[in-house]
Curated annotation (Swiss-Prot):
Subcellular location(s) per record: Nucleus
GO CC annotations on file: nucleus
Coiled coil ranges: 125-145
Biological function: Transcription factor required for phloem identity. Has a dual role both in promoting phloem differentiation and in repressing xylem differentiation during vascular development. Regulates the expression of the transcription factor NAC045 (AC A4VCM0). May activate the transcription of specific genes involved in phosphate uptake or assimilation. Promotes flowering through transcriptional activation of both FT and its transport machinery component, FTIP1.
Protein name per its UniProtKB record: Myb family transcription factor APL
Top-level taxonomic group: Eukaryota
The family this protein is said to belong to: Belongs to the MYB-CC family.
PROSITE patterns: HTH_MYB (PS51294)
């Protein structure tokens, strides 16, 4: 019915018509209204060599590739499309390389961040430790200062108590010393008055130690000497009392106060003096009134020696008269009284502060 060879013959003719080979260039072109180039293996190898010579698909351009290949009938359209496909064929490798580099950089960045985080954590930890150490040391320093302040305050209180006790002790000692001095001073003044009076006056004479007036008139010159020594003895006693009063007031005056106990009237009442003796005693009393300090011990010893000599003379005379008529009563010579404690070894009288006599 239908013949089978016709379609086959038609298909064969179509294939022959579609593929047209250019003998000079060796290109295989289709017979379509828009002829298309068939990239053979040999042509592709020449394209790859040209791209490699030009520095890779990124640097190669269609014009440079066409000039390097030198194939007739090859147009820019053919090279442009094939170059684009070639670039797309090479892109997965590039993307893989870029991805690997990006992953590496990302990993390195993460490592860096991790290291930075760890280092920052270590730094923050170190800073916290340092801050805690500083706070601990400050707390210890504050504790030490507080203890030191407490010890200083305790030491100050202790020193204050010691000073108060010392002041109280000194005040008590001063009061006790003042009381004792007042007590001793009162007793000493009383004893001083009695001792000075007893030392100046001496023990009371025996009633038989002085000769009667009849004996004094008999002996003549001896009587005058006895009166002179007696008068001088009273004057020394008065001068001693006056010296005590002057020492009590610590003021040296030209004249002394008159003593009512030992006045001229009393002496005149005791003994009757002649005019010559009266003038002599008056002159001596006037001279003695202007004296301030007297050597008491020397005068007392001189008076006692002179009195002892007078008594010895009288005893000798009375012995001679006893052979003729009657024996007179013998009188022992008065003993020399020891030096008073108020007199110093040099013969001077230590003047007292107060005297019971005016």
């Amino acid at each position: 019915m239908f013949h089978a060879k016709k379609p086959s013959s038609m298909n064969g003719s179509y294939e022959n018509r579609a593929m047209c080979v250019q003998g000079d260039s060796g290109l295989v072109l289709t017979t379509d209204p828009k002829p298309r180039l068939r990239w053979t293996v040999e042509l592709h190898e020449r394209f790859v060599d040209a791209v490699a010579q030009l520095g890779g698909p990124d640097k190669a351009t269609p014009k440079t590739i066409m000039r390097v290949m030198g194939v007739k009938g090859l147009t820019l359209y053919h090279l442009k499309s094939h170059l684009q496909k070639f670039r797309l064929g090479k892109q997965p490798h590039k993307e893989y390389g870029d991805h690997s580099t990006k992953e590496g950089s990302r990993a390195s960045a993460m490592d860096i961040q991790r290291n930075v985080a760890s280092s920052s954590g270590m730094m923050s930890r170190n800073m916290n430790e340092m801050q805690m150490e500083v706070q601990r040391r400050l707390h210890e320093q504050l504790e030490v200062q507080r203890h030191l302040q407490l010890r200083i305050e305790a030491q100050g209180k202790y020193m204050q108590s010691i000073l108060e006790r010392a002041c109280q002790t000194l005040a008590g000692e001063n009061m006790a010393a003042a009381t004792a001095a007042a007590a001793v001073g009162g007793g000493y003044k009383g004893n001083l008055g009695s001792s000075s009076l007893s030392a100046a006056v001496g023990p009371p004479p025996h009633p038989l130690s002085f000769p009667p007036f009849q004996d004094l008139n008999i002996y003549g010159n001896t009587t005058d000497q006895v009166l002179d020594h007696h008068n001088f003895h009273h004057q020394n006693i008065e001068n001693h009392f006056t010296g005590n009063n002057a020492a009590d007031t610590n003021i040296y005056l030209g004249k002394k106060r008159p003593n009512p106990n030992f006045g001229n009237d009393v002496r005149k009442g005791l003994l009757m003096w002649s005019d010559q003796d009266h003038d002599l005693s008056a002159n001596q009393s006037i001279d003695d009134e202007h004296r301030i300090q007297i050597q008491m011990a020397t005068h007392v010893s001189t008076d006692l020696d002179s009195l002892s000599e007078i008594y010895e003379r009288k005893s000798g005379l009375s012995g001679d008269e006893g052979n003729n008529g009657g024996k007179l009563l013998e009188r022992p010579s008065p003993r020399r009284s020891p030096l008073s404690p108020m007199m110093n070894p040099n013969g001077g009288l230590i003047q007292g502060r107060n005297s019971p006599f005016g």
